[in-house]
Structure formats: structure tokens, C-alpha cells
């Protein structure tokens, strides 16, 4: 569907709120990718990985904090502390044209299909806060979601993305399966000399480390 004719919340978000989730602000990052996402997009577009994948090295402590904050990505950093994300150019995702994504829905990253929903240990929550009105959201300067502002119930919010609870649960299960299979080596990623998350966790769990923290 042409972006000009699509009046879904996603198509109207940038116009109503000033920017969309595909247009990161200062210090913000686009969707986290799994190796499965990368291969699916590469196969569909023919693009080289470097054209749409950004590699963000994290310290071990940052990687541990990321997984603690986002349970859906638990295990993502088990072999490396490099986060793979969608690349932004000129303030927007490389796949954003006008108000729409050029990737077919079946090709898009699982994180994009899930947004604004965030997996938790016991279900899901919203990844963004609600301001209470579209006008307040537009003035906040913070990441917001037009669908979340317009929805009057959780069910209504799900329906605005053509989802129900079962469909959302299936997407969450898909994300967890892809995280479990991540990462597969990318040609452009070189092994880091930094500590692995697993090594940091083992070190923190050692009696010597526990004694040091008590001092």
C-alpha cells in the first residue's frame, strides 16, 4: 500500500508526533537484530549486510544490564558483547521511505514487528510510556507511539497492529527462538578482545568476587 494512502497509526506517527520509532533521536538506537533477521533481510533485498547492520560494542556490564532490562534478549550476548542493530542514515532507518517501511512485513526484523510491545518474564508490557494524549506526546520530546496514545484498551492497541494475544505471544516466542540461535558469524564482525558476558557472570559469582564487593 502506498504510504500516502496508508492511514494506519504507523503511517501517521511521524506526522502526528514529529518523528516515529524509525527516526531515532540523540543517543537512541534502532531495533536490535538477530542473525536470523539479518539473513532474512539480506535474502529478500540482496543488500550487503554492511548496508543495513550497525555493530555496537558494549562493555560486559552494559551487555548484562541490557539483558536484565530486556528479558526477551536474555542470552543474546552469550558469546560476544556486540549488539547488532538497524543502521540509520540522515536520522532515519535505511529502510524508511516517506512514512513507510520498504521491507515487506514478512521480512522485517522481529523487534520491529513486536514494537511497541516488550516481552517480560511473565508476558509483555509497553516499551514506551503513554503521555495521555497525542498533543502531550508530541510536546514531550520523548519516544512515543501514536497507536499507544490513541488506543483505549490493550485489546484496541493489539488490534491497531492486526494482532491478538495469541499472535503477540507467537511473535515473542519467535524472538526468543531467534535470540537462542544468535549469533552466527558475520563477515564484517571480528572477534573482540573484550570479556564475554558469561565470563563476567562467572567472575561475579566467584567467592573471591563476592568478598571484594563486601569490602
Listing of model-derived features with the role each one plays in the protein:
Residues 1-215:
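Short loop/turn segments that flank or connect secondary-structure elements
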